[in-house]
Amino acid sequence: MGDSGDPFLRNPNAAVQARAKVQNRANVLQLKLMGQSHPTGLTNNLLKLFEPRPPLEYKPPPEKRKCPPYTGMAQFVSNFAEPGDPEYAPPKPEVELPSQKRERIHKLRLEKGVEKAAEDLKKYDPNNDPNATGDPYKTLFVSRLNYESSESKIKREFESYGPIKRVHLVTDQLTNKPKGYAFIEYMHTRDMKAAYKQADGQKIDGRRVLVDVERGRTVPNWRPRRLGGGLGTSRVGGGEEIVGEQQPQGRTSQSEEPSRPREEREKSREKGKERERSRELSHEQPRERSRDRPREDKHHRDRDQGGRDRDRDSRRDRDRTRDRGDRDRRDRDRGRDRTSRDHDRDRSRKKERDYEGGEYEHEGGGRSRERDAEYRGEPEETRGYYEDDQGDTDRYSHRYDKMEEDDFRYEREYKRSKRSESREYVR
């Protein structure tokens, strides 16, 4: 029921009396039957949801049968292996480690390389090589070349030592790619020797080359590095034992003869380094003596050289007076700037005090001495800025601790002003 006096008129028919709903006869009978069927008044469909489950079916208990007893393992102990039996400690299987596998493969490759070198050595004959033409004593061997270097580039680099007859850049027969070494034939033997001495270690296309003479046709019993040999006796290839067997033990190898210029060059380099070291030591010795010499000796030496110290002190005094003059000049410039600013400020204040009624005359008579001096533009020395410093002043007293100890001591003993004698400086 709504309120009859509701201002919003939410239920305008609130004043009308409610009428009871007319119930049919069938509904009334149905309600009676429901009440008679179950005390809760629920329908049959709802009552089926609350019906209990049927009871469990009865099963008789199982019959108890006799089980066999538990037995131990004592009867099987005799079947175990004893310490003397081979099955007691079986041997561990041998497994190859990765490092051992790599070492085995490396050894196999070395053996194959030695076999191949022995086979190629039988076929090796540099004197009958169709590619090796020209005079062997005028031919220079250049190795460790850049793979992108061309014959024209190599010729341009080595032409500085003399005219070149031919440049042969060795390439692979199958791929036609350069192998990194070449042979240069000069017109004269002296040019080849000059290039052999000076071109070793030269940089060509970013790589330092190795220069040597042609040893295949000039040195007997010599073999290239691919066949187990190398560059004379200074470098030994992979087949070191083979090289030792071929060389006779009673005499030295003939390949040592062309390497003499290189040894001489190394000796000359060592001599040059020794000269440089001796020069450095000669320059350092007087400094070390001056450091190691005690201070008393230096004091006696300075007494003997009094004239030099006086000249040095006079030069320092002149420098100080110049610095003092520059500083005074800067102070005067600052004082003039302050004077102009204060003068303008005083003029403005004077006008204000004139308006106030003559107070300026009373206060103006007591102006400070510094203000008058600034107005007249006098330097600060006359105004008493340095009135404490009378006589010969030492304006660098705060820097004595930053100077060298010896120089400061003798300078102070030589000349002191009255002002510095009255002060106590920290030594």
From Swiss-Prot:
Keyword vocabulary terms for this entry: mRNA processing, mRNA splicing, Nucleus, Phosphoprotein, Ribonucleoprotein, RNA-binding, Spliceosome
Disulfide pairings: none
RRM domain mapped to chain residues: 138-216
Region annotation (Disordered) ranges: 82-102, 215-427
Subcellular location: Nucleus speckle; Nucleus, Nucleoplasm
Domain of life: Eukaryota
GO BP term (any one): mRNA splicing, via spliceosome
Record PTM text: Phosphorylated. The association and dissociation with SR45 is not affected by the phosphorylation status.
Primary location recorded for the protein, binned into one broad class: nucleus
Any one GO cellular component localisation term in the record: nuclear speck
MF terms (GO), sorted A to Z: U1 snRNA binding
Classification via InterPro entries: Nucleotide-bd_a/b_plait_sf, RBD_domain_sf, RRM_dom, snRNP70_RRM, U1_U11-U12_snRNP_70-35kDa, U1snRNP70_N
SUPFAM superfamilies: RNA-binding domain, RBD (SSF54928)
Modified residues (Phosphoserine): S282
Free-text tissue specificity from the UniProt record: Ubiquitous.
Database matches in Pfam families: RRM_1, U1snRNP70_N
Record function comment: Mediates the splicing of pre-mRNA by binding to the loop I region of U1-snRNA.
Subunit composition and interactions: Component of the spliceosome. Interacts with CYP63, U2AF35A, U2AF35B, SRZ21, RSZ22, SR34, SR45, SR45A and SCL33.
Protein name stated in the entry: U1 small nuclear ribonucleoprotein 70 kDa
Species, as recorded: Arabidopsis thaliana
Lineage: Eukaryota, Viridiplantae, Streptophyta, Embryophyta, Tracheophyta
Name of encoding gene: RNU1
